[in-house]
Structures are given as C-alpha cells and as structure tokens.
Amino acid sequence: HLTEKKLLRLRDSHVNRLSVGVQSFDDGLLKRMDRYEKYGSGETIARRLKELRGVFDTLNADMIFNFPSQDLDMLKRDLDILTDIEAEQVTFYPLMISDMTRRKVVDALGNVNGGNEKRFYREIVRRLVPAYRFSSAWCFSRKGTMIDEYIVDYDEYAGLGSGSIGYLNGICYANTFHIPAYIDQVNRGRLPLMATRTFSLRDRVRYDFLMRLF
C-alpha cells in the first residue's frame, strides 16, 4: 500500500502527516493478524518506513504491545527496529479488546494476559525516552509540537473524514470507514455516519474525566 505513486499523490495534496498502522514487525504476529500477506513481512515494512523519512513532515509508526503470544524479547526487537527507523513519532497502544471483538481476537491471537502490560510499557518508555518526548500516555514524539490524532485539547471536537470520531453537544459519532460510501453520502448532502451515541450527564462526566487523563 505504501507505493511511491500513492505517497506522492498524498504529498502533492498537501498531506503533511502520515500514520502507518504497523502493529508489530514480528512475522509470526503479522501472520496471526492476517497482515503478513496483505502488507508484507516485518522487514519489508521496516525498509519501506525508512524510505519514507523526509517525504512528510511527520511519519508516525502506530504500534501495539501486549499481544497474547508476545514476550519481552519480541517487544525489544520491535523497539530496536523503531530506533533504527527514527520515525518522527511513535504511538504504542496496549492491545484493547471490546466485547464485539473478543472472540475474534482470542481465536486469532489467544487470551490476553494483562500481567505483562505494565512491564512492557516500562520497557517502551525506557527505550524511547529521552530521544522521544511524551505527547500523551501512548504517543512519543521527537518534537514537542507534534500531534496525536487520537488526543484532543478541547471539550468538544468535530471529526471530519472517513473513519473519524467526533463529540458535539453530548453526542459521540463515528463516520464510516468505507471511503466510497463516505463520498456517496457527502455528495448526497447527508452525514456519513456509521454510529452515534447520545451521552447522559453521567456519561459526559465520565468521558470528560477519561479524556483529561491523557
């Protein structure tokens, strides 16, 4: 997917930040997530990311840790590769499972062990800081002014674009990830929504508290 033609089109369209969903450079994990055949081996992805340095103002590598079958050595190898790539920004989220995706994740990856999460996170911080600075709990940037697309500085925010999430007037909404459907709805003068939820006062307080923890 990271072809030269597509990347140049993005750059020429004034896109200045590219976030690449890597998850892990471990081939075993990539195969279990059904990403190896789609996007290539960890070595291929790492090489492509290294070639992307300088094409955009910000190159973000989006990673996940605490996979059920992941051990500390596997995580350290991911960190070794990231250190070599020298991306401007790295996001490292723990594997998060919702009730809707739990069965699928367990079937593909196994049962999640929360006992490793703290130890793995400490290793990530130890390796990335001080070369990187905290932008949020999960986001590490070489420059303090860089953004994390999942973190906002305002009580309310509008999500524009395919797959974006917004929160306005106590309503949280998500736009469709399907780009053709998004374009079709916009052309029809309709909101390209995939899901909405109206928060109660209690929900609003809890949501605001959670957002401020970041």
Predicted stretch roles:
Residues H1-F214:
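C-terminal scaffold of the Radical SAM
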